[in-house]
Structures are given as structure tokens and as C-alpha cells.
């Protein structure tokens, strides 16, 4: 399953980069990431960074999250967050617009692990089934997440039991994403 996630993420990332090149005439660009070091940076121009995905550091894993919470994380989330360095990627899944979260650098990986720990602690306190966020949405109160128990992808309302099924697996979700050059 991990291999399917890595392949599906690589395929979506290729579609995303191609979308940018076709619609904008250049690699993906971000003003928000300007000035933040990353192995992804190809060029800085004015207040914009142009980036290309890069292989992830092979020895890094989400072990810190597992140790902090004494929980085993679903293998798909390990594969998702440790496959590549990249900027966040805008996408559409059916009628849902989202920003697929990615790791920009080793420092960003540490921050992301801390955020996952905070998210899981909140869920534990509220006695909710554990999920791991994968993408933000236009609403600050919803996010796309992987259910740590079943591996299915859900749209969840933060801090509630309200969850809408999106896809049976992370690989299926990634394969169903359409890239947006925004």
C-alpha cells in the first residue's frame, strides 16, 4: 500500500507541475514560501520562489509522532509525508477545493510532526477516532484527513465527529485529484 501512495503522490505531483507549466509557463511558484530555505528551490525572483519536488531524506520518518503519543500511525501517512519535499499543492477533488499539504524542508518536517501531535492530542481529549490531516480546505473548520484506523480519506469538521467519506484509500484520493495552478 505504501508503494501505491508514493506512486500516486508522484503522479499527482507530475500533473501539478505540468499544469503550472502549461497554464503559467513556469514551475510552481509561491510568495508564501519566499525566503524559507528548502531543497526544492530552483529560483528566487522578486518576492516569489519557483520550486520543483525533491526526494525526501531517506532516514526520516514519523517515529516522533508515534513515540510522543504511543500510537502506531497508518503506513499510508508515513509514505505520504516522507516521499518528497515540495510546496503545498492546490487541487480539486470532485467539487472540493483543497491544498494538499507537503513538507518543504527538514525544519518543516519537524513543525508538521508537532502539528500532527497537537491534532491527535486534541482528538484524544475529545474522545474522537484519530485522524491525520493531509489537506486544508477553503473553510478553516474542515480538513481532509486519513482515518488512522481504517485508512479511508474523510472530510472532517475540526473537533467534531462529523466526517464525510471521500475515498477508500489515500492512493485513490491522490489519483482522483485534479491540479490547480493558483
From Swiss-Prot:
Belongs to the Syd family. Disulfide bonds: none annotated. The gene is syd. This is Protein Syd. It comes from the Bacteria. It comes from Pectobacterium atrosepticum (strain SCRI 1043 / ATCC BAA-672). Keywords: Cell inner membrane, Cell membrane, Membrane. One of its GO terms (cellular component) is cytoplasmic side of plasma membrane. It is a peripheral membrane protein. It is found in: Cell inner membrane. The keyword Cell membrane applies. It holds the Pfam family Syd. Interacts with the SecY protein in vivo. May bind preferentially to an uncomplexed state of SecY, thus functioning either as a chelating agent for excess SecY in the cell or as a regulatory factor that negatively controls the translocase function.
Amino acid at each position: 500500500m505504501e508503494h501505491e501512495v508514493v506512486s500516486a503522490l508522484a503522479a499527482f505531483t507530475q500533473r501539478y507541475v505540468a499544469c503550472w507549466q502549461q497554464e503559467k509557463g513556469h514551475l510552481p511558484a509561491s510568495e508564501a514560501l519566499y525566503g524559507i530555505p528548502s531543497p526544492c528551490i530552483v529560483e528566487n525572483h522578486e518576492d516569489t520562489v519557483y520550486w520543483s519536488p525533491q526526494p525526501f531524506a531517506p532516514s526520516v520518518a514519523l517515529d516522533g509522532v508515534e513515540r510522543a503519543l504511543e500510537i502506531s500511525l497508518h503506513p499510508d501517512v508515513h509514505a505520504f509525508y516522507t516521499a518528497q519535499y515540495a510546496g503545498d499543492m492546490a487541487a480539486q477533488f470532485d467539487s472540493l477545493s483543497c491544498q494538499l499539504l507537503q513538507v518543504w524542508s527538514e525544519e518543516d518536517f519537524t513543525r508538521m510532526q508537532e502539528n500532527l501531535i497537537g491534532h491527535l492530542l486534541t482528538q484524544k481529549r475529545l474522545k474522537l477516532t484519530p485522524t491525520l490531516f493531509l489537506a486544508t480546505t477553503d473553510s478553516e473548520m474542515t480538513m481532509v484527513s486519513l482515518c488512522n484506523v481504517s485508512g479511508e480519506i474523510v472530510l472532517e469538521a475540526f473537533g467534531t465527529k462529523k466526517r464525510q467519506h471521500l475515498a477508500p484509500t489515500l492512493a485513490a484520493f491522490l489519483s482522483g485529484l485534479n491540479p490547480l495552478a493558483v
